């Protein structure tokens, strides 16, 4: 027993001496930031896929490959190839994705350390990222989507996040999201400030601009709405003496429009301001209700022995309503 205790004491004493003279690195030395100026961390971001862009929730789901590369001379070794160590055993810049909502990391948290002390960390992340959207032009809008990284525990003088020119950042050409088309992307250092009064920390952002493909909304929203509005014009071609038929058609059109509004509600973003699509739907609704009011007016005129005036009003409305609707469509959907 005494020999065992003596052996443990000698081993611990020798280890302390080796650490003190730098023969082996101490754990505390490795997990502290290198003191030789700001640590330059080279970042690579590649968007493997974008699964969904949700305008209503103002977020997007993406599959992202992220790579960090930095140099720590304290980790240099005499081996002939890179060694693998757990990430939490060495110092690392602790970079966070600041606009994540839910994020899953699929690669193990390990690093490869080259003989010269270069550290390489690779990770694949999948999840949801928040993105405030300006939807005034919906659905004819273009949006910029970003993934913002930040070394939140370090100032810009302690850690620098830079674009890695040795590895290509970018975005895949074929994406799962079918109703958007990527136009361009950028990857660049971008300081991160949690609040306007706080000091900026070192940051990096990958952004891509995308245009919404409007084919879905033309087929599912715009064309059906045009047909419903056009159906309301049928009342102008029915003789005012047939007031029952006119009112029946007008009410049927109105109820169809109300049901249609409920059906498309899930496809429209819930924002506090009116989008171009909202203006189109709102003005179309007003025109449908206006046709019902016109039917009531002509029916009243016909019953009051003013049939000629009622027919003249219908003839004017046959042209006025389509022209007004065309102006509404151009102003809200084109200009």
Describe the residue ranges of each PLM region.
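Channel- or pocket-lining gating/hinge segments that regulate access to a cavity or pore
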Residues: 204-324
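Bacterial N-terminal signal peptides
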Residues: 8-20
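Juxtamembrane boundary at the C-terminal end of a transmembrane helix
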Residues: 330-335
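Positively charged n-region of N-terminal signal peptides that target proteins for export
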Residues: 1-6, 324
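Soluble non-transmembrane domains of integral membrane proteins
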Residues: 24-209
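A residue-level signal for conserved active-site and pocket-lining positions in enzyme catalytic cores
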Residues: 18, 64, 293
């Amino acid at each position: 027993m005494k020999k065992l205790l003596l052996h443990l004491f000698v081993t611990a004493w020798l280890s302390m001496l080796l650490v003190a003279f730098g023969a082996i690195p101490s754990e505390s030395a490795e997990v502290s930031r290198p003191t030789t100026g700001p640590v330059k961390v080279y970042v690579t971001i590649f968007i493997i896929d974008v699964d969904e862009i949700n305008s209503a929730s103002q977020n997007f789901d993406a599959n992202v490959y992220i790579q960090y590369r930095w140099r720590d001379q304290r980790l240099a070794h005499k081996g002939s190839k890179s060694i693998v160590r757990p990430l939490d055993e060495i110092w690392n810049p602790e970079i966070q994705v600041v606009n994540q909502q839910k994020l899953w990391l699929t690669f193990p948290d390990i690093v490869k350390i080259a003989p010269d002390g270069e550290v390489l960390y690779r990770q694949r992340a999948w999840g949801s990222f928040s993105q405030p959207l300006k939807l005034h032009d919906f659905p004819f809008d273009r949006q910029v989507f970003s993934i913002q990284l930040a070394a939140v525990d370090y100032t810009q003088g302690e850690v620098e996040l830079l674009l890695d020119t040795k590895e290509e950042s970018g975005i895949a050409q074929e994406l799962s999201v079918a109703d958007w088309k990527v136009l361009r992307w950028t990857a660049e250092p971008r300081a991160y400030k949690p609040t306007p009064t706080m000091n900026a920390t070192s940051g990096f952002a990958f952004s891509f601009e995308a245009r919404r493909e409007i084919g879905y909304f033309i087929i599912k929203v715009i064309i059906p709405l045009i047909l419903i509005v056009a159906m309301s014009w049928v009342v102008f071609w029915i003789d005012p003496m047939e007031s029952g038929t006119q009112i029946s058609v007008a009410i049927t059109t109105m109820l169809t429009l109300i049901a249609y509004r409920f059906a498309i509600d899930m496809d429209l973003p819930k924002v506090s301001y009116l989008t171009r699509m909202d203006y189109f739907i709102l003005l179309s609704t007003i025109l449908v209700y206006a046709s019902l009011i016109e039917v009531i007016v002509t029916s009243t005129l016909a019953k009051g022995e003013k049939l000629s005036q009622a027919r003249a009003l219908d003839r004017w409305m046959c042209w006025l309503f389509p022209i007004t609707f065309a102006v509404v469509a151009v102003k809200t959907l084109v200009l």
